[in-house]
Amino acid sequence: SFLWPLEEESVKLAHGVDADYALEDYASFTLRAYQIFELGDMVAIEKALGIKGHNAIHPCRRCTLKGVRNVEGGEKVYYIPLQLPHGHEPSGGERDPANLPLRIHEDFQEALDAMAQAKTKKEREAISKNTGIRQAPAFGRVGSIDYARSVPHDWMHLLLENIVPNLVMLWMGRYKGLDSGTEDYHIDDVVWAEIGKETVEATRHIPANFVRVLKDIAKDRSGFTAESWCFWFIYLAPILLRGRFKRKKYYKHMLSLVEIMKTSLKYSLTSEELDDLEVKIIDWVQKYER
């Protein structure tokens, strides 16, 4: 694995390497360094943590919530909604977004120990299925990584490569064949044609240092990078989508996500801002599921 050389170097740095510090006289000391965070897209992190990940019964790397699937529709993909479908009852407060059953570092080791002690392959697979943990995580030799807390969700992949493009597809009525159900958040194609033209015009005179030229979002999104989605959603969408939804609540919901994204991009956050951000994220997700 390409991670092996990095772990080898991490082991050496944990033991320490000789270094010199220049003041009036050179003074020798032992330099140590530890990796405490790891970032990557969803699939890469799932492999690094040794978890089953998306589509598993316990897909989340941060909590132990059990996924559900549309059995009647023949779906095999598990997902974790806060509002459970009919026929799925929560146990206790497991669906309380302000009090999720979070994983802790020890959960990983306990699951691995249980699998190691399993007497049969079937027993081992059952433990893996019920915990969502497949195998030992990477970077386990030094011990500086907390498997439950040191691997946060990557902002770019979570928002710009997932949530934002999917929202646009939902608003276009082109997301996996889903209609709007009892809601009415679809924006008509003729309106999207106008939005696409305005997107092109909006970036025509903006210096390239801020954003590259954007194509017609209604016709061609293949060239939209994470940077493109970020600029379009945070700076253009609040103007381009104003008055375009049939009901104002969808526009306000979009603005709430814009505010969340802007806040999370700040270089520093106070404890009060973090608490406020948590409340706003929970509110956004709950309104999305409605």
Where are the regions that the model predicts?
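Short, solvent-exposed secondary-structure capping/transition elements
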Residues: 15-19, 68-73, 244-253, 269-270, ...
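Alpha-helical bundle/repeat cores within regulatory domains of eukaryotic proteins
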Residues: 248-290
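Short, hydrophobic/amphipathic alpha-helical patches that form generic packing surfaces
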Residues: 62, 231-242, 253-263
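General structural concept
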Residues: 1-7
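Charged (Asp/Glu and Lys/Arg) segments that form or flank catalytic channels of large polymer-
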Residues: 8-238
